[in-house]
Design a protein with these regions (language model features):
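Hydrophobic faces of well-ordered beta-strands that scaffold small-molecule active sites
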Residues: 35-39, 65-68, 121-125, 152-154, ...
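Active-site beta-loop-alpha junctions enriched in small/polar residues
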Residues: 40-42, 70-71, 126-130, 156-159, ...
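Active-site gating/metal-coordination segments in enzymes
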Residues: 32, 81-201, 205-208
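Mid-to-C-terminal alpha-helical segments outside catalytic/metal-binding sites
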Residues: 4, 28-37, 46, 50-65, ...
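Bacterial N-terminal signal peptides that target proteins for export
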Residues: 2-13
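Catalytic pocket-lining loop regions of alpha/beta-barrel enzymes
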Residues: 167-308
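An N-terminally biased module of ancient metal coordination in phosphate/nucleic-acid-related enzymes
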Residues: 29-108, 114
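Bacterial N-terminal signal peptides
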Residues: 12-23
Length: 377
């Protein structure tokens, strides 16, 4: 091989090594698009994106990201679907069951990264049953087995369209003391709690109070020492934003979705509660018409310190697909004040998750026995 060819080969090798190395480096603080407060690495059959592929998907567009799987496993029942193996909960009538191994998988995946790469992720514990009084024991065991890894719990589900009724065993409830134990322990440790609970039943009629709203507010008020993020602002695929009926002649018009959330934000007893605007279904509602966009922009500009953007993507395969939900919000991003936009896309994530990291590490230092060099357990 001549000298020129050798130099060319070395140059290509150096470039390839640089590309791999840069995939794990965070984007510069001033030029990435967002931090992702709501991301699933794996799906309903526990398959997903390799963490290094996800780093490449993040690239220089995403600064940091939560990291969790799906706490529920879809059963493949031959009696129900034959040779077809469902990968999503809508593809089968067979039940879902809690899959606790997801937490070990997420921890091992995170620990496979270099310390610099780990800085970009905030793993979350999800593999517990919120209707089980022993759920707290699971969370504690995960923290003891994997100290230095987890920042929060969730996304875990209480009420969810099409899902809640499929879960094997007891039905989760906002009034279950098991859930109070979970949130109280999260507050003790400093773990952020990301909770999915629909605000209402599917296809609710206009001018009717949301079925689960008062229970949710009561739960949140019972745990002022826990940082809680209400996923999707309580919305779902067929759990539509709460609406006041146009032209209603009722004596007092019921508030709409944004007014309900705004009232919660203004409630001094709920200062510890935040809302994520993740999921493409939520984005569809937010940009449904120019009039709705106007209201959403005004709401987000006024309350940007309590909102976080997240994708709610599950096991993405490309950067283009992963960024699609972010760009669905472009009509809103363009009209937000620079401060509001930065808060929702980036700053609130950093503020909340950095604080949680610090609190959880301090709790672990105090409560998790330090292994000695000869400890082979």
């Amino acid at each position: 091989m001549n000298t020129a060819a050798q130099c060319s080969r070395r140059l290509l090798l150096a470039v390839a090594c640089l590309v791999v190395a840069l995939a794990g480096q965070p984007a510069r603080a001033d030029d990435y698009l967002f931090n992702d407060s709501h991301f699933h690495l794996t799906n309903y059959i526990q398959r997903g994106t390799d963490i290094r592929d996800y780093l490449r998907i993040m690239g220089d567009k995403i600064g940091r990201s939560t990291l969790f799987g799906i706490p529920l496993q879809q059963t493949w029942s031959y009696e129900n679907s034959g040779d077809y193996g469902p990968t999503y909960y809508l593809q089968s009538d067979a039940p879902l069951y809690y899959y606790s191994f997801t937490d070990a998988y997420i921890a091992k995946t995170y620990l496979s990264l270099s310390p610099k790469q780990r800085e970009r992720f905030d793993p979350m514990i999800t593999g517990f049953n919120p209707a089980d009084m022993y759920a707290v024991d699971h969370i504690r065991r995960v923290l003891e087995l994997f100290p230095g890894v987890f920042t929060g719990i969730g996304e875990f589900t209480i009420h969810k369209e099409f899902v809640s009724s499929k879960v094997a065993g007891d039905i989760a409830s906002l009034t279950d003391p098991a859930l109070d134990r979970i949130l109280a322990f999260a507050g003790e440790v400093g773990l952020i709690a990301l909770i999915h609970s629909d605000i209402d039943t599917p296809f609710a009629k206009a001018d009717t109070p949301p079925v689960y709203l008062e229970q949710m507010k009561a739960l949140l008020r019972r745990h002022p020492g826990t940082t809680i993020i209400w996923a999707h602002m309580g919305l779902g695929r067929v759990v539509h934003p709460v609406q006041a009926q146009a032209g209603s002649d009722t004596a007092q018009r019921n508030p709409n979705q944004l007014e309900l959330v705004e009232a919660m934000i203004d409630d001094p007893a709920l200062r510890h509660v935040y809302f994520d605007i993740s999921w493409d279904e939520v984005a569809k509602y937010a940009v449904a018409s120019p009039a709705i966009i106007d209201k959403v922009v005004a709401f987000m500009n006024a309350h940007s310190d309590r909102l976080l953007f997240g994708t709610d993507n599950v096991a993405p395969t490309s950067q283009e697909a992963h960024l699609k939900v972010f760009h669905m919000w472009d009509p809103v991003w363009r009209r937000l004040t620079p401060e509001a936009s930065e808060n929702i896309r980036k700053n609130n994530y950093v503020r909340l998750f950095d604080a949680a990291r610090e609190k959880v590490r301090a709790w672990e230092k105090k409560n998790v026995p330090q292994r000695q060099p000869n400890d082979k357990s």
